[in-house]
A protein has these predicted regions:
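Auxiliary Fe-S-binding modules of radical SAM enzymes
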Residues: 1-70
Length: 70
């Protein structure tokens, strides 16, 4: 789960989300992106001040993250 958090942080440093954002990961990796007890999403929420959710995108490779602001 730390690998997905690092990938998301790297992506978001460039994107700087200003509104609620969906993070996309490959199929079956939603819980790894979310983190145990949602800790990864809480870290991102505190750092950027916006809400994050996680969804799946089968076109992505393992450890690849894509974001989309709502």
């Amino acid at each position: 789960s730390k690998i997905y958090l690092a990938a998301a942080l790297s992506l978001l440093e460039k994107a700087l989300p200003k509104s609620d954002t969906v993070l996309y990961v490959t199929t079956g990796k939603t819980s790894q992106m979310t983190g145990q007890k949602r800790v990864n999403l809480e870290i991102l929420n505190k750092k950027y001040g916006v809400r994050f959710s996680v969804s799946e995108d089968g076109a992505l490779k393992e450890f690849e993250v894509r974001s989309e602001s709502k």
